[in-house]
């Protein structure tokens, strides 16, 4: 009997053949097929989200599914190298499947809008690929729909992006969701004021990312600092800071420029958001941090019931385009469509797909009549499927087939 090693395990030939047979039918971990009703709902939802972005005057852009490795290199501040899908072209260049739309669009904007000094508003829809094994069941290929506002560093631009985010969530059918807004410079300012080393900063970042605020408290207690700074560190575990708390934080931040500026920006942002009437969907969280280090201003994440992952994320990145040769402020966001679909399903919120399908079942002698009828229906906007009648099938069989495939009506055309 022949034996082989597979994934460092000794297997017999019959077991290897079974593995190969399974791989013919099954997808790799982290990717999945989407078909029938679920596929229709996803396409409908994507179209609705996309139309919401267009309403704000954004223009479509498509970037390549794969790019050169340095577009997503460590100096860019995006997905870690270990989580990238990397491969080589014939010339030996390292290529990467797109893990994040923002660097791709920043590169594209720097190339095609290098001389523009007016705002550029771009939106997109496509898939991203992250080879992460941190969480069992997490998709490694996911669909994102998002927008980028380039060339506008104002707080009004921040407010517009947040308004688009909220309106997109409402258009999807969600009613109960919250957009947590923070500022990247608050965390940076704290670590700078406390004189933390790179290792200490990374330890603190990990504690906050894991929501381990007992660990944060213990970490802060081990440091020597004044009372004002200690109180500012104490705000890291508050997920919904009110006006008076932000005003108090502003007083404590005097003397710490980055911290002061970040809190002042959030207070001003609140006033802009009132004009859009979306305050009830916004909360302020100074402990909010992002895995992406290219953010320089506000950052935000959207949450709802039925999913532990953010359904939307975004922020301001005023230095990223300079990496590609264009000095321009920018802000953007991405809706994770798959997470949004999961949330809608778990909250029993229906995606109202309109079915308009017809089935023409015909026998051989009625072929020309069936063609004529199907063409009439298609001209009228009805999605029409033709099936040659099988003498072993009954009309009830075809009616059942229509129900299973969400076909509204069945017509039988016989000679």
Q: Residue spans of the language-model regions?
A:
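Short, glycine/charge-rich beta-strand/loop segments that flank catalytic centers
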Residues: 63-71, 120-131, 178-187
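Short, surface-exposed recognition loops or helix-turn segments adjacent to catalytic cores
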Residues: 176-186, 204, 283-287
């Amino acid at each position: 009997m022949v034996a082989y090693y597979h994934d460092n395990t000794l297997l017999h030939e019959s077991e290897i053949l079974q593995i190969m047979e399974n791989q013919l039918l099954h997808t790799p971990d982290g990717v999945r097929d989407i078909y029938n009703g679920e596929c229709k709902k996803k396409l409908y939802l994507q179209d609705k989200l996309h139309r919401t972005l267009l309403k704000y005057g954004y223009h479509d852009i498509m970037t390549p599914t794969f790019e050169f490795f340095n577009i997503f290199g460590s100096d860019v501040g995006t997905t870690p190298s270990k989580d990238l899908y990397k491969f080589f072209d014939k010339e030996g260049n390292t290529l990467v499947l797109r893990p994040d739309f923002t660097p791709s669009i920043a590169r594209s904007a720097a190339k095609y809008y290098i001389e523009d000094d007016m705002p550029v508003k771009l939106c997109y829809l496509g898939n991203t690929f992250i080879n992460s094994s941190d969480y069992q069941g997490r998709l490694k290929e996911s669909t994102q729909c998002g927008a980028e506002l380039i060339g506008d560093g104002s707080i009004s631009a921040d407010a517009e992006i947040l308004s688009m985010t909220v309106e997109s969530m409402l258009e999807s059918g969600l009613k109960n969701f919250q957009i947590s807004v923070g500022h990247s410079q608050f965390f940076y300012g704290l670590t700078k004021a406390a004189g933390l080393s790179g290792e200490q900063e990374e330890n603190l970042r990990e504690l906050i990312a894991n929501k381990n605020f007992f660990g944060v408290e213990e970490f802060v207690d081990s440091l020597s600092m004044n009372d004002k700074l200690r109180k500012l560190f104490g705000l890291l575990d508050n997920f919904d800071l009110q006006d008076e708390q932000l005003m108090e934080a502003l007083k404590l931040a005097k003397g710490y420029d980055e911290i002061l500026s970040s809190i002042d920006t959030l207070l001003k942002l609140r006033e802009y958001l009132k004009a859009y009437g979306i305050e009830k969907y916004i909360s302020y969280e100074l402990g909010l941090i992002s895995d992406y280090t290219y953010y320089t201003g506000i950052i935000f994440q959207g949450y709802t019931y039925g999913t532990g992952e953010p359904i939307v994320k975004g922020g301001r990145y005023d230095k990223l385009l300079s990496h590609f040769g264009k000095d321009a402020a920018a802000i953007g966001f991405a809706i994770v469509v798959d997470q949004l679909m999961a949330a809608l399903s778990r909250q029993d919120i229906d995606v109202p797909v309109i079915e308009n399908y017809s089935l023409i079942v015909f026998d051989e002698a009625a072929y020309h009549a069936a063609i004529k009828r199907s063409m009439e229906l298609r001209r009228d906007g009805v999605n029409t499927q033709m099936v040659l009648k099988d003498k072993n099938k009954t009309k009830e069989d075809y009616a059942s087939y229509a129900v299973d495939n969400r076909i509204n009506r069945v017509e039988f055309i016989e000679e």
